[in-house]
């Protein structure tokens, strides 16, 4: 994956770096009635079926995947069954820092499936991979309010330092990479209204439950699908499970990427009219 890596001499009192990106966003909508020939690099598909440090595919992950997909025959059936399983068994936990850690084995073993998008969509991706369905997390950033009236599915463009969001994709024969986001279903159920919605058939949740199986709203920018990263020049040992927040270190150690005001980073977006 591509990234910006900057280093500053110890004599620089107030190091500063600014990055400007110009992107075009679009809604992703799948037409389930239309099938087409789709070719993908076998290396990409193998990567989307592989285990990572926090997404093992054996043990409790495989057992859970088998339970969730019991009776499902096609990859579409498996993806739909896992999507519904995640919504039925997991929940959004507002107290989770950042977007979560994505440690699905620990979550499944503990029985506590509460977390945020990097946890909840990671469960979806891990169960899909364990079922033989290529899937991947897509790490990115919301950049604008939702056009569909859901406050929890949008962001304040002027201040995006807490707008990071992970989505998911599955590769399905006849359709290619298809958008998914069970984590946002659970976010709406937990936070869109004062009461915690427990039933995805609720009038507020039902459109999101149906809409986010195969679709994404284009108020979001995807950065990468990488796992287990070795960042250049990183002093702290080990890998980064995913890359969605700015990372920084100095002689005293690593900065807290989930505390932008202490780290001192800001993110903003401006819509450019065509």
Give residue spans per PLM region.
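A surface-exposed beta-strand-loop module
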Residues: 1-20
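Non-catalytic surface loops within mature trypsin-like serine protease
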Residues: 10, 23-27, 172
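Secondary-structure boundary elements
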Residues: 15-17, 21-34, 39-115, 125-126, ...
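Generic alpha-helical propensity signal that fires on short helical segments
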Residues: 33-43, 100, 104, 151-155, ...
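Short alpha-helical interface elements
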Residues: 44, 107-111, 149-153, 193, ...
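Hydrophobic/aromatic-rich core segments of domains that either
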Residues: 122-235
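Low-complexity, Gly/Ser/Thr/Pro-rich intrinsically disordered linker/tail segments
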Residues: 207-274
